[in-house]
């Protein structure tokens, strides 16, 4: 019975549905609903195609920059900075706007690419801070290196006359002497103020050339002083050898039996009568002393003491000559033997004279030579003093 009732209800529902559909179709409501539904479906499909084909909002300049290696490195540094300080909300906006949700490098890869070692103390901060520090050190590096080069050079920068330092000027190797370039007249200072910048650049080279010329002049003066000192010493040696008689001629004379003492080695040496007798031959062979008498024509006269001394010497020599004559040494053979010690001119002039007269003449000449040698000592006394030391070059004993 229940089944029959259910079947009856189902049949009634289908009949009601069919009746409703037929009624709606007849009134046009069902067709209008079907058309609206069909239009809504087509509109939904068209809108879906537009959404799929719609281009997203992209920053073209940022996209080009991120395509380069440096741009990706900068974006990675900024992302690492935000991650280091846990700025998650900023990262949520940063990644979509930059379209860098994937592809950015981590901290380790960034440190390796930048050459930063974590052991250097950079763990306490982001990598961006270490990059800025290194850039600042590189900026300060060239100036400190230039300062180190200036200090290692050892020479301070040369100053121009206007007081400006010239860095490009090379240090001079020429020894600088004290007092150079320190004194300047007021006219030079006023002229320096009026000079242009070009002349101020050329002044260091001019000062170098002036220092070179001054040092060369100083060396030339030094050389001339040494040359004059050497020439004076050689002339003094020659005068000593010319004015002092030869010792070998006196000592090697075998005519006299008695040994003859050596004369004193001074310009104004005096000998005893016996020494004069033994040195007649050597004195007669010295023509340069006789020829020098003419140059002393204008010399002042001898003093009375010297004339008295010469007269006493003449008297002693006359006595010696008389003794020699009394001994019988006036023969022709002895006369010829004495002539062998005289020059040819003396032999021709005195061939007919006796030995006593020859001795007197020679002794008179010897006394005059001695007196003239004393005068030469007075006139030609060397008073030069060495310019290289405080000690006299040489000293002479005047009788």
Curated annotation (Swiss-Prot):
Q: Where is the composition biased (Polar residues)?
A: 163-172
Q: What is its main location?
A: cytoplasm
Q: Which Gene3D superfamilies match?
A: 1.20.960.40
Post-translational modification Phosphotyrosine, affected residues:
337
Q: Where is the composition biased (Basic and acidic residues)?
A: 259-275
Q: Give the Pfam families listed for this entry.
A: FOP_dimer (PF09398)
Which InterPro entries would you find in this protein's record?
Answer: FOP_dimerisation-dom_N, LisH
Where Phosphoserine occurs along the chain? 152, 160, 202, 301, 326, 331
Q: Which GO terms describe its cellular component?
A: cell projection; centriole; centrosome; nucleus; perinuclear region of cytoplasm
One GO BP: positive regulation of cell growth
Biased composition range(s): Acidic residues: 245-256
What keywords does the record list, in alphabetical order? Cell projection, Cilium biogenesis/degradation, Cytoplasm, Cytoskeleton, Phosphoprotein
Q: Which domain of life is it from?
A: Eukaryota
Q: Where is the composition biased (Low complexity)?
A: 197-217, 290-302
Q: Which GO MF terms are attached to this record? A: protein homodimerization activity; protein kinase binding; protein tyrosine kinase inhibitor activity
Q: Where is this region: Disordered?
A: 139-217, 239-309, 328-357
Task: Spell out the PANTHER family in the cross-references.
Answer: CENTROSOMAL PROTEIN 43, FGFR1 ONCOGENE PARTNER/LISH DOMAIN-CONTAINING PROTEIN
Q: Quaternary state and partners of this protein?
A: Homodimer. Part of a ternary complex that contains CEP350, CEP43 and MAPRE1. Interacts directly with CEP350 and MAPRE1. Interacts with CEP19. Interacts (via N-terminus) with CEP350 (via C-terminus).
Q: What does this protein do?
A: Required for anchoring microtubules to the centrosomes. Required for ciliation.
| Protein name per UniProt | Centrosomal protein 43
Which organism is this entry from?
A: Rattus norvegicus
